Design a protein with these regions (language model features):
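Active-site cavity-forming subdomains of large catalytic enzyme subunits
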Residues: 1-172, 195-201
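Short alpha-helical patches at coil-to-helix transitions and adjacent helical residues
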Residues: 2, 153, 207-214, 242, ...
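A general alpha-helix detector
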Residues: 42, 102, 216-220, 236
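Short alpha-helical scaffolding segments that buttress acidic/His motifs in well-ordered protein cores
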Residues: 100-107, 156, 179-189, 217
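Structural helix-adjacent loops and short alpha-helical linkers that scaffold large soluble proteins
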Residues: 167-176, 225-230
Length: 246
């Protein structure tokens, strides 16, 4: 399975959005490849303000791929000014709202490209010292750094919450013990796993990424005698994840 991410300022973004359509030139379609938008906050600001958005060729704006946040906004505005002065040759201006509606339309029509946000993923990354995150993965549940020397891979596991509700209450001590064991086991996986490439091995050994999720939430809430859509269920879910996280 493959997933390609493209930033919203890329000159090919409009063609990229159409890659999964069932109509049009088949030579310009990729029906078996997943696609995702990698959207900077500045684009959403332009959508809200109903302003234009400028598309660039990456060879003329090489820094944009490797920066985010305020630095991205300053550099992007500078490139727009250069385009107006004629210093950049390959660019196109489009209404941001029109492009956003096209993104949503294709998502409704084909399920692609997915909507992911570059700035929140980087701002909240605990590995911002390791560089800029350029994409997520096939399921958009991990955000890790990649480079020519490192292919990001993650070791994942899940806890069955239903097994931690005993006699109508959440056994927090049992859940905490399960989390501790699961994290230890996932870390062991890093050392004994098979890696198809040296780049994947380099990434795993250097950063030791693990992801611990949950399953059985509905069953757990049922055993706690809570309606899934109730305020009490929301509070219980918060408490569950607080125990798991801390």
């Amino acid at each position: 399975a493959t997933c390609a991410y493209l930033e919203t300022w890329h000159l090919d973004i409009e063609d990229f959005i159409d890659l999964r359509r069932n109509t049009g030139d088949e030579r310009r379609r990729t029906h078996d490849m997943n696609t995702a938008n990698w959207i900077p906050d500045l684009f959403m600001k332009r959508v809200i303000e109903n302003r234009d958005w400028t598309l660039f060729s990456p060879d003329e704006v090489p820094e944009l791929h490797h920066i985010y946040g305020k630095e991205f906004e300053r550099k992007y505005a500078g490139y727009e000014e250069n385009a107006r002065k004629g210093l950049i040759k390959k660019y196109k201006s489009v209404p941001a709202l029109k492009l956003w509606r096209k993104m949503l339309g294709r998502l409704f029509e084909t399920g692609h490209p997915w909507i992911t946000f570059k700035d929140p993923c980087n701002i909240r990354s605990p590995q911002d010292h390791a560089g800029v995150i350029h994409s997520s993965n096939l399921c958009t549940e991990i955000t890790l750094n990649t480079s020519a020397e490192e292919t990001a891979v993650c070791n994942l596991g899940s806890i069955n919450l239903e097994r931690h509700v005993i006699d109508g209450r959440l056994d927090e001590e049992l859940l905490a013990a399960t989390v501790k064991t699961a994290i230890r086991m996932l870390d062991n996986v890093i050392d004994i796993n098979y890696y198809p490439t040296i780049e994947a091995q380099n990434s795993n050994f250097k950063h030791r990424p693990v992801g611990l999720g949950i399953m059985g939430l509905q069953d757990a809430l049922f055993k706690l005698n809570l309606n899934f859509d109730s305020e009490e269920a929301v509070n219980a879910s918060d408490r569950l994840m607080e125990v798991i996280s801390y």
